[in-house]
Amino acid sequence: MGNIHIQTKSKEYDVYVGKESLSHLTTIVQNMQPSVSNIMIISDEAVASLHLQTVVDALQIDQKVFSFVVPSGEKEKSFENFYAAHTSALENKLDRNSLIVALGGGMIGDLAGFVAASFMRGIRFVQVPTTLLAHDSAVGGKVAINHPLGKNMIGAFHQPEAVVYHTPFLQSLPEKEWRSGYAEVIKHALIGDVKLYHWLKEEVQTLADLRDEKLIHILTKAIPVKANIVAQDETEKGVRAHLNFGHTLGHALEKELGYGNITHGDGVAVGMLFAIFLSEQVYKVNLAYEEMKQWFLKYGYPKMPSDLSVERLVGLMKQDKKANAGTIHMVLMQEYGVVNVVSIPDETVHIALEAFQKDMVEK
């Protein structure tokens, strides 16, 4: 098992990664000061049916434990479920010394974290991720719900007390969720650990390789990339924006195709390829785009859909949180491991996106 220490200006906490990580949960709760009054577990239907009772049984405590379960899917990261969770919290007499446990993937981590950030102006919470994708979202304290006009537009920065990454929970994931989460692993390698990138190319030939000791190795390498960036810039005023590599187009694809119709990781994978495609033009460098594209396709990541309106996608990219005064800001790559946030004119993005779309269709 590997423990990773996270240090930000507002809080320090640990990420427990391994096959026995859940055994730490009771100790984490018992060591909290002031002592925890009661616990609300927030989960979704798919995860709850598999793992909720396991977590309840692992909590060897005297305090009341209850659950709030929402339907599964990104579209459930909504104001309606956020409001309903507050209602449940009030009905079950949560107070400022209560604890919320987020049991699920990134959607649940975001929703439960935002409930924790806002209930009585902020209470404690613990992340118990059940997906590979959540190795990114569970660390760093960004919590949010979606708005019909954009993803993660209503939210806060609220760090967890701990992250308990019990890897056996991931074994029930369908292949599309392994692929989705692996995109964020690739992102962390490309922007912050080139050695990990080369290791992935050698050791992860198929998604089936993302298991057991290799999985633990990947998590203990990818999470510190994010941790190091968050330590420098907790509230995304500077270098934390680098973590959005691939997300400008990725989020636009999610919005245009409809939340749930493309996984977050599939969107980010296409977005990273476009960022590399555009980076080669902007920086006049060779980033081996063609080789990268074939590597991505090998894992089953989608191509850029040929029937999408480039004009509509550019409009959605202008709504991205990095955008400033209606100007698109993208994270571009100078070389592997070196990225920057760059202001890009609409026309440049439009021309490049048309060329990228054509390239993805023809080859």
From Swiss-Prot:
Pfam short name (any one): DHQS_C
Cofactor(s) annotated in UniProt: Co(2+); Zn(2+); NAD(+)
Superkingdom: Bacteria
Coiled-coil ranges (or none): none
GO molecular function: 3-dehydroquinate synthase activity; metal ion binding; nucleotide binding
Reaction equations catalysed: 7-phospho-2-dehydro-3-deoxy-D-arabino-heptonate = 3-dehydroquinate + phosphate
Alphabetical keyword list: Amino-acid biosynthesis, Aromatic amino acid biosynthesis, Cobalt, Cytoplasm, Lyase, Metal-binding, NAD, Nucleotide-binding, Zinc
Pathway per the UniProt entry: Metabolic intermediate biosynthesis; chorismate biosynthesis; chorismate from D-erythrose 4-phosphate and phosphoenolpyruvate: step 2/7
Cited Gene3D superfamilies: 3.40.50.1970, Dehydroquinate synthase-like - alpha domain (1.20.1090.10)
Protein name, per record: 3-dehydroquinate synthase
Species this protein is from: Bacillus thuringiensis (strain Al Hakam)
Gene that specifies this protein: aroB
